[in-house]
């Protein structure tokens, strides 16, 4: 079918690469490109004997547009799958524009020096991508990603209008460390230490970090504390789903995680402001990332399950209706299949599926689009096929 360039070689990228190699009818060739080529080579050497997909590797600095353009022109992929850092989204989009190559990512752009993420920077590329005749698919992970597909599916098949969405992200896994993050520590800690927010009646309502707490009983996991966070898909879903009055995002955290995080905040280790140390400028949060366990190393020691989904409330044929779409994923099953814990798995699988939707022409329109702006049905079918089966509940317990 075609070739895909995957930029990044962390935990999520590793899962996406494994899944591309399982899907060699679509992904005839992939190039793994990262700042550290040796990591790419190690993964290629492990996977090449197991797949018909031809794997190539390259070194690239994703902050350098000229380097990216040269590499894309050399390999000539049909689509670029950006699994690098959110700070690098715009340089990679610039390179895709210059080479007229389709673009897919899993997280929206975030300036390196400001812990604030929103879509305005990427949405500003809409006209340029339209004129170039190429597609940019934004947010093809789980959240954002599957949550948007779930929302589009609910809108298409279950509702005339959706008034309330609660996105619930529960990780019931235990890795045995006193403190570690399940994905990039720098991104994770920036996200959870920022102020929370939700959208109500078309306006953002801001909260203090971890101010709003709820308790929910998750199927396959049990009762967990969850906290309201700001999350990027709220912004696009509020625009793209008909009838929205309120949309919120909750994530579960254990008390040990929160206690450690508070201590680190109190001593300044979560700061993104540079400081001078022995004549060198360092960012405390980046230093903390260097001493914490690598999320990619958590797979063999993480047990338990995740449960991530969306509770919808709205109207169908003039009557009130509730509907819950969710996925349950087992950390150890993920590790057996691709050597990863479920957090990376639940992001890496949809990343591959999004690239497949663009590569096969199943989703085809020039411009910059969020995932809920496409037909959800082929993506929903692919989730069941490629390892993230979804479940439905037509009488869910609601979040107050």
Model-assigned labels for residue ranges:
Residues 49-64:
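Rossmann-fold cofactor-recognition segment
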Residues 156-400:
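C-terminal catalytic/substrate-binding lobe primarily of soluble NAD(P)-dependent oxidoreductases
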Residues 35-39:
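Helix N-cap at the beta1-alpha1 junction of Rossmann-like dinucleotide-binding domains, i.e.
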